Amino acid sequence: MAFQVLFICLISTIVFASILWRKQNKNKTLLPPSPMPLPIIGHLHLLSPTPHQDFHKLSLRYGPIIHLFLGSVPCVVASTAEAAKEFLKTHEPAFSNRPANTVAVETLTYGFQDFLFAPYGPYWKFMKKLCMSELLGGHMLDQFLPVRQXETKKFIKRVLQKGISGEAVDFGGEFITLSNNIVSRMIVSQTSTTEDENEVEEMRKLVKDAAELSGKFNISDFVSFLKRFDLQGFNKRLEKIRDCFDTVLDRIIKQREEERRNKNETVGKREFKDMLDVLFDISEDESSEIKLNKENIKAFILDILIAGTDTSAVTMEWAMAELINNPGVLEKARQEMDAVVGKSRIVEESDIANLPYLQGIVRETLRLHPAGPLLFRESSRRAVVCGYDIPAKTRLFVNVWAIGRDPNHWENPLEFRPERFVENGKSQLDVRGQHYHLLPFGSGRRACPGTSLALQVVHVNLAVLIQCFQWKVDCDNGKVNMEEKAGITLPRAHPIICVPIRRLNPFPVV
């Protein structure tokens, strides 16, 4: 009897909420179309671990701009290039903030001390200028070319050695190691590689786990009274990740402070300043317009380490998956490589401009598998977008994943065809945010500041794998599974395990 009463009360509540919701929608200013929400959870029940796919399905039913309540948080989702342009360009001043009030952001940024999630204001503007002029600018990238070359050679040697011994390569692990070593050397002139293989594996796992947890929907972020309960266990996991990173960062920072105090010979041995040196210079500069504290420095390092490592690694992994599943594309890329570079030396960054088909492969990978499937913004004030009223403090999701698969802009959108970027003048179609049907790195003020670095790393390391090796896939049909899993950077659900077969001998040049 008690169960029946409870059931009747629940149904009555849902019916009442539905009537109230419809009545309120009629009386309010025009919001975008929306499914009917449930009490307390809103539309959370409609989302799976891959929300970009769920948003896409909802947009097919309700339109290019939809309104949702994720718990008590009002959200809008833009799923077409035209809608994205309205939010990211026409109304960019109103959508220049990123939502920072999440457990993951608060925990991994030392209490909102970072750059990537800082509100649009003096601190963010200062750090963005610093990134583009020094930390991730052209001069810094040119300066660290020898670092990227050295890590690429180490990468080739590791893969080659496994091929000689008949051992399979786990692309995910190798790409994480490669990207992490490049980024670590740019930040602190060190790699995560030590004699302790367990420590190396732990660092790789920390980066992957941080990226994965940051992209998962934590119900505590959307239903406020559940925050203290940590129902999914995310809070404890995030704190553990942050504490592990913190131990490493404290050790590195303490060592660097001691070097700078004592003018240690180690400082002189470095050919040029790394990112940590630049950040310390600013923190010690009394005339600097912004004073950086230790938490700002650590939070910035974590921003770059996590974002810079995982995005490049995931992109290279998806690219290899597509090449293995499309052997005709792989062969065409090899032919281009042989014609332009030859077989007597390894491809270099300076060759990339002369390899349009390789560039097409990378762009096609970013179209189908953008490292960030959703762009996150938050409205700082009320805005009217495409005739819809968007209140302040509304969270915006731009579904880059769906936009890249829109048949209105892409012929046969689910087909992996790099030719679409090298035919009919499409080679000028860039990925830096000027073309709103291709937004893998975002657009406008909040576009990814590390785009140039990511493209350099992805192009040249994908190129050496194409040039130097053939691949034997450990499965019956020679294909790899293309399922996605949860994460802020679109990770693969299944690892790619292949045995490398040497195609040309890189030893004379490495």
UniProtKB/Swiss-Prot annotation:
- How does this protein lie in the membrane? Single-pass membrane protein
As recorded in UniProt, its EC number(s) are: 1.14.-.-
Q: Provide the binding site for heme.
A: 448
Which Pfam families does the record associate with it? p450 (PF00067)
- Signal peptide: which range, if any? none
Q: Where in the cell is it found?
A: Membrane
Give the protein's cofactors. Answer: heme
The record's induction entry says: By fungal elicitor.
Q: Which GO terms describe its cellular component?
A: membrane
Q: Which domain of life is it from?
A: Eukaryota
Under Gene Ontology molecular function, one entry of this record is: iron ion binding
- Kindly list the residue ranges recorded as spanning the membrane: 64-84
User: Keywords assigned by UniProt?
Assistant: Heme, Iron, Membrane, Metal-binding, Monooxygenase, Oxidoreductase, Transmembrane, Transmembrane helix
Q: Which cysteines are joined by disulfide bonds?
A: none
Q: What enzyme class is recorded for this protein? A: oxidoreductase
Q: Which family does it belong to?
A: Belongs to the cytochrome P450 family.
State what protein this is by name. Answer: Cytochrome P450 93A3
Q: Which organism is it from?
A: Glycine max (Soybean)
